[in-house]
Amino acid sequence: MSMAALHEVVLDQVATPPALQSGGMVRLLTCGSVDDGKSTLIGRLLWDSAAVTEDQRDAILQASHSRAVNGEQIDFSLLLDGLQAEREQGITIDIAWRYFETPKRRFIIIDAPGHEQYTRNMATGASHADIAILLIDARHGVKRQTRRHAAICDLMGIKKVVLAVNKMDLIGWSEPAYRAIETEFARLAQGFGFTEITAIPVAALTGDNVARRSACMAWYDGPTLFDYLEAVEPRVEPADAPFRLPVQLVLRADGDFRGYAGTVASGTIRPGDRIVDARSGLGAVVRRIATMDGARAFATKGDAVALQLDTELDISRGAVLSEVSRRPINADVLEARLVWLAETPFDPELGYLLRTATDLTPVTSMSVQALVDFETLASTPAHACAVNDIADCRILLGRATSLDLFRDLPATGNFILVSAIDGATVAGGVITWAQSGAPAVGENVLVLDRALLARGLCADLGDSPADTAEFHRRAQEAAILLRSAGVPVLVEI
């Protein structure tokens, strides 16, 4: 196989993410700073696990020797770097998608770029992933881009992280250096929602602790990367997750057929179940679950279906059908954390639209409240954001839309923000708080302003950057507690 032919094979896996609907499939993201060895690590994993054809092996060997980028060693990154610009620069720019199977499991590997200027591509990949492999160069330790990528993984709801400390061969296989990096990352991860962090020392180029155990690191008694990936439990939706069907379109055919079509975002539905349109409150009983392959006895997350009901509901695209007892929130006031993806900074004077699963809602007002500081990972008060920033924002919508909080139901708790001028995506984020109706300041609304907080809860804080960040954190935590108790709150600090 020529390099041109290999290029075609890899490009086919770069441009568009494959269908991600498979019960036993793990969606795996590799991320980290530039030159930490992400593409080399995944290429090595594919190579050692016999996931590469003989033709591809021959092409990679020939290309590696002709380029001599690593002396006589194989350039495993060629298996992932499919774009011409990537091969010329030796970096990853776009997201590379690669299927990978072992006797025990199937994977979709998402190789994300490390350069800061391509962070938005990494965020796109993270939004599809179940597990993240976060690489760190053992020579350099945790860097700013490492923190940024960890924050984006947390933002996108990834719960399991593999900390792959790479290039251990270049520091003499030093256990103290590895332990120091492991400890530093564990400390910074305390501010995130990760439920499992597994640190593995590796050398991607030589294959140590990738698919085979390293004789050079006898002090390490944990799993190899390959062993971990075969054993890790994939993300599984709770069996009792509430039912959500964002309506994509209403189908009409054969005179009396009327089906509310969409992809089940959460939960399970069966004929005989009672459902409700969250926005209008109109309810009906599911009479039939229609698919391209005929009627189904039930439908669950990821299934594309058309529900036939015993009563016609006057709804359209953007509606969310749910179970009666656990409905989404109908909200026109949101608080969200987002990553800004556009080269053009946020401008409150420009028009934006909020796109949820199938709904598109005009934004009437949006303000930035805080930015994540990638040195300290604290939220610092701010009023502007630019490309690659992670911001906490308050968003007022022109009308209510049906949604959930991301922590409760990720499938219907995320969104993208698009430009009202050209439809380009400018940000992607998650909903942290929502309510119906913008509260007007008055006797029934508690206003948490700076003066009130400074008299009590924050009386011990000064004006230093650290104290300012803590002031903001306490204000937000107080607001969350009050809102959970049913008290309408405005935070004005």
What are these regions (language model features)?
Residues 2-40, 102-103, 253-444:
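C-terminal effector/interaction modules appended to NTPase cores
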Residues 7-117, 129:
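P-loop NTPase switch module centered on the Walker A-proximal segment
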Residues 36, 47-51, 115-116, 139-143, ...:
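Conserved nucleotide-binding/hydrolysis micro-motifs of P-loop NTPases
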Residues 66-70, 81-93, 188-197, 230-243, ...:
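Active-site phosphate-binding and catalytic loops of NTP-dependent enzymes
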Residues 105-107, 112-118, 126-179, 489-493:
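Conserved Switch II/interswitch segment of TRAFAC-class P-loop GTPases
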Residues 171-240:
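Canonical P-loop GTPase G-domain recognition
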Residues 205, 222-261, 276, 283:
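Accessory interdomain/linker segments of ATP-dependent helicases and helicase-like nucleic-acid enzymes
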Residues 431-493:
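Glycine-rich phosphate-binding loop of ATP-dependent small-molecule kinases
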